[in-house]
Amino acid sequence: MKKLFLFFTLIFTAFAANSGLFDKKQTFLKVDDAFAFSATLSTDKSQLQAHWDIADGYYLYQDKISAELVGKSNPLSLHTQQAAELHQDPYFGEVKVFTHSIDGIFRGTFNNADDKVEITYQGCTEGFCYPPETKVLRIGDLAVSQEQIVEKTVEKNTALLSEQDRLADGLFHSKWAIFGFFVLGLGLAFTPCVLPMLPLLSAIVIGQQQRPNMMRAFSLAFLYVQGMALTYTLLGLAVAAIGLPFQIALQHPYVMIGLSILFVVLALSMFGLFTIQLPNSLQNKLNTWSQKQTSGAFGGAFAMGMIAGLVASPCTSAPLSGALLYVAQSGDLFTGAVTLYLLALGMGVPLMLITLFGNKILPKSGEWMNTVKQTFGFVMLALPVFLLSRILPEVWESRLWAGLATVFFIWFALQMSKNGFGYAIKIISFALAMVTVQPLQNWIWQTQTTTQSAVENMPVSQVKFKQIKNTEELDRTLAENPHSIAMLDLYADWCVACKEFEKLTFSDPQVQQQFQNILLLQVNMTKNSPENKALMERFNVMGLPTILFFDQQNNEIKGSRVTGFMDADAFSNWIEKLL
């Protein structure tokens, strides 16, 4: 019995030992369990957002992750939020790998539901390496994510929030914030896009045959501002709904030339060459309300205000961008319309006050009124120069201003008497005419030196931007960025504030010093090409100027976007926060 017991004990011990040997055989997870993959689309369909959940002890090779649209040769580059780690791999040597979950994006245009994206990746674990894994995804089958990964950024920049974002957030959190836009409009009244509206309003109120009383002057100014506010509001909503192509269409050379001709005709009428008026039959019906569609008529004031809204609308500012951003994101057209209206109304109030008080301090009606009217005719001629400067080379802008100033000073000198103080003013006016005519002399007689000619054709800022033509070139350039951040300037020839950036901000020595640590990129949006449209849709650009900043992972830095003009000091401080 003892021998039998010993026999069975030895048998079970042997099986137990063998069982332990089998237990030492290592088991590995299936590839979908080791690297659980999922993908979604961004709301604007410009990003395919990929996510991998990596099991403990496993890792993905960074350089083995790739993607492309099936049937198209261009690969899609991956931008990840997480930094890869260095790893000594027994198969590939020292490589960069991901050992935890990955959130990344493939940028492109994913509007066609039938398109397919092929994503390939490969990973390993200790003692075992998986073959490359390929996923083929149909665009139409992907869910849409409500969050864009591109908006995330590194920790040091989370405190940044651009002014337009703060304003848009304010509208989301409190509808009472719309009244703050009226105050912001007061400040915008003194920007280069709105100030040219002052002479037009002054010409309407003051430049008429008889000096208006205070009530009539207020009514004219008020109607002018209402016309401007109405146009500004409607165009703002159109830009928010349609996008930058609508804004660019308003800046087409045909539109600029047409408006310029209109202002020239109005200016000539102020010189008394002719009178613009409605047919007699219609005048009798409308009576005094629209007896003359020249300066001083209520209908003319409102119409000129609407035209002024066209002139001012292309200039993008932070308050305007904030309102447009709110409309685009919320779809709340009513709040957006009220916000834009109050912004435009704030812009018009200072113009009204300046015009009203200017009208009040003038002496009573007399012969001087004709001189004042003709003076405002010259002022109105400045508006075509302002408009044409958006589409003409910079050298022609200076020639047009020189010609207008020269003619004005000669005319003004001829108005002065030959006695006493008037004679002194006459001499000074002729002297000023001789100074202002110099650019025209240089042009006609070709007396410019080689240096002057070179300066005319050289960008004012002398900052060297790498020109970008499309999204693919942008992605490649960002991937090769040797600096900590990259800056993308969206520019157009018709954009007045863009030229201000070039002349006043980018030329600043402090800003240029900071630019040495930044990859400088620029896209010319003047022609609104298909490539321009793709960039505009990808980054949800509301207007120009717009400047974007990207981090080392080639993602746009949240809250860093600049829209509207920013002076050198403010821009330098802004960059300092990013570096």
Swiss-Prot record:
**Domain of life, per the record?**
Bacteria
Q: What does this protein do?
A: Required to facilitate the formation of correct disulfide bonds in some periplasmic proteins and for the assembly of the periplasmic c-type cytochromes. Acts by transferring electrons from cytoplasmic thioredoxin to the periplasm. This transfer involves a cascade of disulfide bond formation and reduction steps.
GO BP term, pick one: cytochrome complex assembly
Q: Which residues form the Thioredoxin domain?
A: 449-579
| The EC number(s) this enzyme carries | 1.8.1.8
**Classification via SUPFAM superfamilies:** Thiol:disulfide interchange protein DsbD, N-terminal domain (DsbD-alpha) (SSF74863), Thioredoxin-like (SSF52833)
Q: What is the name of this protein?
A: Thiol:disulfide interchange protein DsbD
Reaction(s) the record says it catalyses: [protein]-dithiol + NAD(+) = [protein]-disulfide + NADH + H(+); [protein]-dithiol + NADP(+) = [protein]-disulfide + NADPH + H(+)
Signal peptide positions on this chain: 1-16
Quote the InterPro entries the UniProt record gives. Cyt_c_assmbl_TM_dom (IPR003834), DsbD_gamma (IPR035671), DsbDN (IPR028250), DsbDN_sf (IPR036929), Thiol_diS_interchange_DbsD (IPR022910), Thioredoxin-like_fold (IPR012336), Thioredoxin-like_sf (IPR036249), Thioredoxin_CS (IPR017937)
What is its EC class?
oxidoreductase
**Gene symbol?**
dsbD
Please report the organism this UniProt entry assigns to the protein.
Haemophilus influenzae (strain PittGG)
Q: Where in the cell is it found?
A: Cell inner membrane
What's any one GO cellular component for it? plasma membrane
For this UniProt record, the keywords arranged alphabetically read as follows:
Cell inner membrane, Cell membrane, Cytochrome c-type biogenesis, Disulfide bond, Electron transport, Membrane, NAD, Oxidoreductase, Redox-active center, Signal, Transmembrane, Transmembrane helix, Transport
UniProt lists the family membership as follows: Belongs to the thioredoxin family. DsbD subfamily.
